[in-house]
A protein has these predicted regions:
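Feature recognizes metal-dependent phosphohydrolase scaffolds
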Residues: 1-638
Length: 638
C-alpha cells in the first residue's frame, strides 16, 4: 500500500479524485483495470508524411494501414484461403461500399458470398480486438451495430450448441433483413480502426495535389492522430489567418498546377477579380500566362514588404524586384551575376518604388484576404490543424518534426533573432509553435509575418533551405535554382549529432524504442542515387511519403511509411498507387517492401510506452486515495 502524501496540494487533488472514485471498491477496481491494461500489447502506431494533397494514394495507405491489414489476413487464414481470396477480402475491408457495388453489378452478390465475407470479416475483427480491452473495443464499434458486433466478437470455439446457434442466427438475420451491406461497412470500419491505434502525420498534408480538402475532411473523423506541421501546412495556416504573402503563395502554388477546385469549390475562394485584372494588365502569348504573371508580381511585392520590415530574417538577397533592369530585361542577383529574364512584362512595378502595390493590386489583395479569413470550410480544417498539431512532438522515445532543427556547420544549434530575443534548439522550436498559435488567435502583424517565414525561411524548422522562387519564376538557367540546405540535413548522418538533438528534446530510449529515433519528412529519399531512409545507425528515419507523383522519377519509389507495433518497427517502401478502380476490379494493393528493424526479443507492452507511464502515475494516485479511505483521512461516499 502507498501511504498518501499529506501536503495540502496533494490532499486537495485526492479529494477531487474521490469524486470520480467515491468508494474503496471503485478505487481498487480501477487499479485492477489499469494494471491489466499495462500488460496488453502496445497499440500499432502508423507514421505518414508529405501527403501533398494526393487523396487517392493517401486513402489507400490509410485503408490498408501500410499493409498491416494484409499481414493480419495472412496470419489469420494462412493457407486456408488462396492469394486471390485474401486479396478480395482485403479490398472489401479497404473499400467496402465500392466493392459491394461492383460485386452487385457483376451479379455475384449471392447469399453465399455475403455469408462467406461476413464470417471472414468477423474472424479478422475478433483477432484484432484481442489486443485491446473490451471497453476500448466497444467504443470503437460503430454505434448502429454495437450490440450485435460485440456479441459476434466474443464467440468461442468451445461454446455449447445453444450459443453457437444463437450466433449463427445473428448472421442469418443480417442476411434475411438485407442489412449485410451496412453491416459489412461497419465491420470494415472497425477492422481498420483496430489495425492502427494511432496515426502520426509528419507534415505537408497540403501542396500541389488537389485533394487536400478531402484529406482534411477524412482526418476530422479519424479516431486518434497527431500532426507535425509541415511548411505547406504552415503556409495554408498563415493564409487562413489573413497573411497576404501566404495567400499569394497559396494561389501561385495551386494555379501553376491548375488546382482551381480546392480554391473555388472546396473553400469558396473567388478568383474572378484576380483573373480579370491579370487579363487586362498583362500580355498573353509568352511562356508565362497573364494570371501567373500577376500573382508572381503580387507575391514578390508582398514578400519584399515583409523582408524590409524584418531585417532579422536576413533575407535581403531575396529583394530582386528592385534589381531588374527594365531596359535590358535582366536581373542582377546577390552574387553580382546578371541574368536575362524570361519576360519583361512588369507593368505594375514602379522602378522607383517596386514593392508598393498599385491601388488595383491592393484592392485585389484586400478582397482575397477577406475571402480567406471568412472561408468556413477552410477554417474548420485549420482549427483542426491547430488543435491536433504542433511544430514537434516527443512520443514513445521518438522525436517527430517535419523538417529540421537548424544547426551551424559545427553541429551546434543555430540561434535565431525572434522579435528581439535569441532562441536556439528546442527553445527556438517552442517559439515557432507559440508564434504560429499567436498568428491564429491574435493575428498581429509580427505573428503573421512569422507565418510566412516559417513557410520559406532558411532558419525555419519547417523549411531549412534557401528558396529561390524568383529565379525559378523568371530565369531559364537552372544553375540559378540551386537551393542550399541547412547543415542539419548532412550532419544528421552522424549518430552523435542525432543523439545531441534527441538529448536537447529530452528524448530518452524506452523499451518500445530502445535507441530512440528522429522521424522526419520534408526531403524525398532519392533511392536512385543510393540514398536510404534509415540513417545514422538507425537513429534518423526519413519517411517522406513520396505521394507527389512529380517526385517519383527522382525517388525511384512512391515513398515510405513507418509502422511501430508490439513486435518492433517496419519501414515500408511503396510502389506507385494506380487507381481505386483497379484496386476494386483486380483486388490490386500497393506493392510494398518491408525493412524490419528494432525487432524486440519480447513483445512491447502498454507498460513500455508513454501511456504506460501515465497509467502507472494514475495507479500511484489511486493507491494514495485507497490509503486515505482506509485510514479515514477521506470519507467514502455511497
Amino acid at each position: 500500500m502507498v501511504a498518501f502524501d499529506r501536503n495540502p496540494q496533494n490532499f486537495k487533488y485526492l479529494r477531487l479524485l474521490s469524486r470520480q472514485f467515491p468508494t474503496e471498491q471503485s478505487a481498487f477496481t480501477e487499479i485492477i483495470n489499469l494494471s491489466a491494461i499495462l500488460n496488453l500489447p502496445k497499440g500499432t502506431e502508423h507514421f505518414m508524411s508529405d501527403v501533398h494533397g494526393e487523396y487517392e494514394a493517401f486513402m489507400h495507405i490509410l485503408n490498408n494501414c501500410s499493409g498491416v491489414v494484409r499481414e493480419h489476413v495472412d496470419e489469420i487464414f494462412g493457407e486456408t484461403l488462396s492469394f486471390d481470396e485474401k486479396g478480395e477480402l482485403c479490398t472489401l475491408i479497404y473499400y467496402p461500399r465500392e466493392k459491394i457495388e461492383l460485386v452487385r453489378s457483376q451479379r455475384e452478390d449471392s447469399p453465399t458470398w455475403y455469408k462467406t465475407m461476413l464470417d471472414q470479416l468477423i474472424m479478422v475483427a475478433r483477432s484484432l480486438s484481442s489486443r485491446y480491452t473490451r471497453s476500448k473495443v466497444r467504443k470503437a464499434i460503430p454505434r448502429d451495430y454495437a450490440y450485435i458486433i460485440d456479441e459476434l466478437l466474443h464467440t468461442h470455439p468451445d461454446e455449447n450448441n445453444y450459443r453457437v446457434r444463437y450466433h449463427e442466427r445473428i448472421v442469418e438475420s443480417i442476411l434475411e433483413t438485407a442489412s449485410a451491406d451496412d453491416f459489412i461497412e461497419s465491420l470494415a470500419s472497425l477492422i481498420k480502426r483496430l489495425a492502427v491505434d494511432h496515426l502520426h502525420l509528419v507534415g505537408d498534408i497540403f501542396d500541389r495535389g488537389g485533394g487536400a480538402a478531402k484529406i482534411m475532411d477524412r482526418l476530422l473523423t479519424y479516431h486518434s492522430l497527431d500532426i507535425q506541421w509541415g511548411n505547406h501546412d504552415l503556409l495554408w495556416m498563415g493564409a487562413a489567418a489573413g497573411e497576404p504573402a501566404c495567400i499569394a503563395t497559396v494561389l501561385r502554388n495551386n494555379l501553376r498546377y491548375d488546382n482551381y477546385e480546392i480554391l473555388e469549390n472546396d473553400y469558396g475562394i473567388s478568383l474572378r477579380e484576380l483573373v480579370a485584372f491579370a487579363d487586362a494588365t498583362y500580355t498573353a502569348g509568352e511562356s508565362i500566362t497573364p494570371l501567373i504573371k500577376a500573382i508572381n508580381v503580387l507575391l514578390f511585392k508582398l514578400e519584399g514588404q515583409i523582408i524590409q520590415r524584418h531585417p532579422e530574417f536576413d533575407m535581403t538577397d531575396r529583394l530582386l524586384l528592385d534589381k531588374i533592369d527594365h531596359d535590358t530585361g535582366t536581373v542582377t542577383l546577390a552574387d553580382g551575376s546578371v541574368w536575362p529574364l524570361t519576360t519583361n512584362d512588369f507593368p505594375t512595378v514602379d522602378p522607383a518604388d517596386p514593392y508598393t502595390l498599385t491601388s488595383q493590386e491592393q484592392h485585389i489583395i484586400d478582397k482575397l484576404v477577406s475571402e480567406f479569413v471568412t472561408a468556413d470550410h477552410l477554417h474548420r480544417h485549420i482549427d483542426f490543424l491547430y488543435s491536433h498539431g504542433s511544430i514537434y512532438k516527443v512520443a514513445n522515445g521518438n522525436l517527430l518534426f517535419h523538417g529540421c532543427v537548424p544547426l551551424n556547420e559545427d553541429g551546434t544549434f543555430s540561434s535565431m533573432n525572434c522579435l528581439g530575443t535569441w532562441h536556439a534548439g528546442r527553445d527556438y522550436l517552442d517559439f515557432c509553435d507559440h508564434i504560429a498559435r499567436r498568428a491564429w488567435r491574435v493575428g498581429d502583424r509580427d505573428a503573421l509575418d512569422w507565418m510566412w517565414y516559417l513557410w520559406i525561411g532558411f532558419n525555419s524548422p519547417a523549411s531549412g533551405r534557401l528558396v529561390r522562387t524568383f529565379e525559378r519564376a523568371y530565369i531559364a538557367d537552372k544553375s540559378t535554382w540551386v537551393e542550399p540546405m541547412d547543415p542539419y540535413f548532412t550532419l544528421t548522418k552522424s549518430p552523435s549529432v542525432c543523439d545531441d538533438i534527441m538529448r536537447e528534446f529530452g528524448v530518452a530510449p524506452m523499451a518500445c524504442s530502445p535507441t530512440g529515433h528522429i522521424i522526419n519528412g520534408h526531403t524525398p529519399v532519392k533511392t536512385t542515387k543510393g540514398e536510404q531512409p534509415i540513417r545514422a545507425e538507425g537513429k534518423l528515419l526519413v519517411i517522406d511519403g513520396g505521394f507527389c507523383r512529380a517526385y517519383h522519377p527522382k525517388t525511384g519509389i512512391a515513398g515510405y511509411t513507418l509502422i511501430s507495433s508490439s513486435r518492433g518497427c517496419r519501414l515500408k517502401s511503396h510502389r506507385a498507387f494506380t487507381t481505386v478502380a483497379e484496386a476494386l476490379t483486380r483486388n490490386v494493393d500497393i506493392e510494398s517492401e518491408t525493412n524490419r528493424f528494432d525487432q524486440a526479443d519480447r513483445r512491447r507492452m502498454v507498460s513500455d510506452t508513454d501511456s504506460g507511464a501515465k497509467i502507472r502515475s494514475q495507479i500511484q494516485d489511486l493507491r494514495q486515495l485507497l490509503d486515505a479511505y482506509r485510514n479515514g483521512a477521506i470519507e467514502e461516499r455511497a
